[in-house]
Structure formats: C-alpha cells, structure tokens
Curated annotation (Swiss-Prot):
SUPFAM superfamilies: Actin-like ATPase domain
Gene responsible for this protein: glk
Molecular-function GO terms, alphabetical: ATP binding; D-glucose binding; glucokinase activity
Keyword list, A-Z: ATP-binding, Cytoplasm, Glycolysis, Kinase, Nucleotide-binding, Transferase
Phylogenetic lineage: Bacteria, Pseudomonadati, Pseudomonadota, Alphaproteobacteria, Sphingomonadales
Organism for this UniProt entry: Zymomonas mobilis subsp. mobilis (strain ATCC 31821 / ZM4 / CP4)
Enzyme class per UniProt: transferase
GO biological process: glycolytic process
Domain of life: Bacteria
Protein location: Cytoplasm
Chemical reaction(s) catalysed: D-glucose + ATP = D-glucose 6-phosphate + ADP + H(+)
Name assigned to this protein: Glucokinase
Family matches, as Gene3D superfamilies: 3.30.420.40, 3.40.367.20
Length: 324
C-alpha cells in the first residue's frame, strides 16, 4: 500500500510517497521539501503536496516530528505549526497514521537500511547483527539517543532522553571545560558538548581557559573552520568533540548491552571523514575491565540522505505489518 511519509523539523517539512507491505518499506519516492514558515499548518502543506503530485494522496500518513510526541498539543521552536494528534486523521482526511519522534524514526530507518548506507568507523568491519541491541545516537540540534532491539525476526525501537545525562569529564582539560560551562548552564548534559551548538560551547570554553581572545561565530561558520582546519582553536574544539562522542557512545553501548553502535544526525555526517583519524575509537574502547569487550563492537555511521522519511515509513510498516 502507499502512504505519505513526512519528516517535520523546525524550518523544513519533507514529504514523500512510500510503498509498504508486510512490515517492509518497498520504495521511497522523490522528496518534496517545504519551508514551514511559508505554510500556516501541516494541513496546508499536505494539500500543497497533493497539488504538486497532481493526484489524490494516500489515506495513510507516517509522520516524524522533531520533538516530543506525547501530549494533546505539539509545538516546535522555529515552526509555526501546531499538531493535535487526536485530530490528525480528520484534518488530513486519512484513515490511519503513525506519529513518532524524529530520532525514533532514525532508529526505525536503521532496521530497514541497506548496509551500503552504513559506513564503518571502528571495531570489526561486519554487518549489524540480526539479533540483539543496537545503540543509536545522533548529534544535531541536540543529541538524539535510542536503541533498536532485534529478536526472532522482529524489531522494537526504544526512544530515550539519553542526550540529557550528565557530561563526565575524563581528563584535566575536560574538568576545566565542565567548570567553565557550569558557569553558564549550572547542569551540563552531554548534549551541551555533543551537538551542533556543542562545538561552540567547547570553543568558547577553550578560549577562556587558554586566555585567547575570540569572536563569537555562528555554528555553521565555526563548523566550517574546524573541518577545514582554518582555525587552531576550532580544530582543538573538534578534537574534543570527537573524544567526547567516543566516550558517550561507549558508555551508552555498555548501559544498553549493545552489540553494535550506529551514529546518525546531521553532525555525524559532517564529521564522517574526521572520526576515523580522531581519538573517537580510543575513548570508545577505554572502559577499564570492559576494554576487550568494547573493541569487539562495530561502530557504523549513517550516510542515507533522508533517514527521517525512511524511518517514518518504516514505523508505519512495522505497526501495520498486517496491511497489504
């Protein structure tokens, strides 16, 4: 059957027609992107998508939403849309829908993703296991964390708020970074470090620690400077970012009993070429008595262009697997 897959973020909403059957996503059509600010509601964007397609839309929707999906009224920063889950079927004139958190969608996507879209970062270069737990984390605007449980030919996605656990420094410089950030945030969660804005937090902390004058840069400019090696302090911040990402990826794998780890998120794709040469692996495996265990865990990175759309469709297919 056909469904409409939708990935809704703060500034953009992406639409695609997907075909699902027997719990699988058979195909995902061409993506259409709308700016949310140019459409007063999801309903109007839905109608615009139908007009662009030039035919009636399927009466089923799979929606990935960049925020919590529990509650009677859902809102996002930088997005004028308001979602009321109880009235979605009526507003969109559909029969069924699935509404999930955007990072939950990424976890669903991993369950359906071809291995060619998973780049090897470290550990054994082998396919993701067909049984067991896969830890999934993704730095973006924040830090998304989920885990994927595969068992007896089925899978289950468990969404978490793991991005909000405490940042744990592992050397003296990180002690100083934490102390500096506590002056601003009081409580420093790991997403204050491992996220798009996190690089700026590290950068400013390092400048203060070293007594180096610096100019406040927007995130895009800072990431560009760090990745292109145009600023020593930005490079140092990126090195610290990768160290911390490795540490928390390992911690989460231990906590979740994972047999493999997958990194997603917009930032993950940016640092794909940098990670293998960074201190990521050293921090990932350095877990004391469990170092040998950690060295046997494969770590992959998602390169699929739109995991949110694929994951939304996959979530629908998983829920309505009996529908042909």
């Amino acid at each position: 059957m056909e469904i409409v897959a939708i990935d809704i973020g703060g500034t953009h909403a992406r639409f695609s027609i997907a075909e699902v059957s027997n719990g699988r996503v058979l195909s995902l059509g061409e993506e259409t992107t709308f700016k949310t600010a140019e459409h007063a509601s999801l309903q109007l964007a839905w109608e615009r998508f139908g007009e662009k397609l030039g035919r009636p839309l399927p009466r089923a929707a799979a929606i990935a939403w960049a925020g919590p999906v529990h509650g009677e009224v859902l809102k996002l920063t930088n997005n004028p849309w308001v979602l009321r889950p109880a009235t979605l079927n009526e507003k969109l004139d559909i029969d069924t829908h699935v509404l999930i958190n955007d990072f939950g969608a990424v976890a669903h996507a991993v369950a359906h993703m071809d291995s060619s879209y998973l780049d090897h970062i470290c550990g054994p270069d082998e396919a993701l296991p067909s049984d067991g737990v896969i830890t999934i984390l993704g730095p973006g605007t924040g830090l998304g964390v989920a885990h994927l449980l595969r068992t007896e030919g089925r899978y289950f996605v468990i969404e978490t708020e793991g991005g909000h656990i405490d940042f744990a420094p592992l050397d003296r410089l990180e002690d100083k970074i934490l102390a500096r950030l506590r002056e601003r945030f009081r409580r420093v969660s790991i997403e204050r470090i491992i996220s798009g804005p996190g690089l700026g937090n590290i950068y400013e902390a390092l400048a203060a620690i070293e007594g180096v004058p610096f100019s406040l840069l927007d995130d895009i400019k800072l990431w560009q400077m760090a990745l292109e090696g145009k600023d020593n302090l930005a490079e140092a911040a990126l090195d610290r970012f990768c160290l911390s990402l490795g540490a928390i990826a390992g911690d989460l794998a231990l906590a979740q009993g994972a047999t493999s780890v997958v990194i997603g998120g917009g930032v993950g794709l940016r640092i794909a070429s940098h990670l293998p040469e960074s201190g990521f692996r050293q921090r990932f495996v350095s877990k004391g008595r469990f170092e040998r265990v950690m060295s046997k865990i494969p770590v992959k990175l998602i390169t699929y262009p739109q995991p949110g759309l694929l994951g939304a469709a996959a979530a629908y297919a998983n829920k309505y697997s009996e529908v042909e």
